[in-house]
């Protein structure tokens, strides 16, 4: 079975900046995607957030562009629509941006897991789309 996962912005940042305790698992996820062993989805707004945040770390523009190009080689971008924003704004999520990411993933067809490093921000997520950290996903994948 080829898993379809939706990655939150922070998973990309953890991998790129080698930050947090699970950046190696994030790296493993993107290696699987590069090898076509899993399918990765993310939102267009997530990529924009990533580019902006990378700029605040003073990462050279050329490196940002190269990373963006690499992401697009193994990630399918999904655009949130009006319904996604309406659901996010009326949801119990504390952070609207997190809600937009989650409801964008729900809108997509057949996403198996939502992957985020900030799992505590997704406690109000529905049970129809499980939320995993990169480590939890890799444990599930390797079963």
Label each PLM-derived region with a short phrase.
Residues 8, 98, 118:
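Acidic active-site catalytic centers that drive phospho-/nucleotidyl reactions
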Residues 12, 18, 99-102, 125:
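A generic signature of intrinsically disordered, low-complexity regions enriched in glycine/proline
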Residues 1-4, 74, 106-143:
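Acidic, PIN/NYN-like endoribonuclease modules and their adjacent C-terminal/linker elements
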Residues 12, 48-50, 121-123:
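Short, active-site-adjacent cap segments at secondary-structure transitions
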Residues 27-95, 99, 103, 108, ...:
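PIN-domain endoribonuclease scaffold, especially VapC-family toxins
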Residues 1-42, 56-62, 132, 137-143:
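Short, well-structured N-terminal submotif of metal-dependent ribonuclease cores
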């Amino acid at each position: 079975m080829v898993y379809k996962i939706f990655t939150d912005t922070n998973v990309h940042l953890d991998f790129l900046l080698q930050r947090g305790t699970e950046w190696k698992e994030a790296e493993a996820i993107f290696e699987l995607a590069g090898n076509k062993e899993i399918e990765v989805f993310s939102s267009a707004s997530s990529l924009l957030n990533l580019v902006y945040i990378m700029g605040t770390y003073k990462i050279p523009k050329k490196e940002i562009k190269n990373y963006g190009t690499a992401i697009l080689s193994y990630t399918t971008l999904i655009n949130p629509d009006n319904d996604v924003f309406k659901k996010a704004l009326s949801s119990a999520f504390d952070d609207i941006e997190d809600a937009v990411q989650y409801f964008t993933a729900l809108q997509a067809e057949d996403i198996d897991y939502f992957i985020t490093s900030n799992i505590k921000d997704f406690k109000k997520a529905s049970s129809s789309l499980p939320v995993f950290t990169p480590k939890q996903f890799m444990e599930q994948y390797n079963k």
